[in-house]
């Protein structure tokens, strides 16, 4: 599984607290093994963001991503629920 990171994702990630960064790393490990592990609550987005998917880092934080090629994804953004309005 290859994961690519957009500059937007990297910029938002740098601003997160250390606790959220650690949780995100753990969820990324789970994601690499199984995109649809129930602990991630992976879901497809709707409306203008229907090409994107998201999974939960914790109750408030999400990672938005897009499937890319056969065995890779692009992490687009990370943040609280307000990131949905950017799509």
Task: Go through each PLM region and give its residues.
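Conserved short hydrophobic interaction patches
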Residues: 27-30, 81
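Intrinsically disordered, low-complexity serine/threonine-rich segments
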Residues: 12, 34, 58-59
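Enriched for short, Lys/Arg-rich terminal
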Residues: 7, 57-62, 66-87
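Generic secondary-structure boundary/loop-capping signal
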Residues: 17, 37, 42, 75, ...
């Amino acid at each position: 599984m290859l994961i690519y990171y957009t500059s937007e994702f990297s910029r938002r990630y740098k601003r997160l607290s250390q606790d959220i960064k650690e949780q995100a790393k753990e969820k990324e490990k789970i994601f690499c093994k199984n995109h649809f592990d129930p602990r991630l609550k992976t879901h497809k987005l709707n409306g203008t963001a229907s090409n994107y998917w998201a999974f939960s880092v914790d109750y408030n934080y999400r990672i938005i991503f897009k499937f890319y090629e056969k065995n890779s994804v692009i992490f687009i953004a990370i943040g609280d629920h307000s990131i949905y309005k950017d799509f």
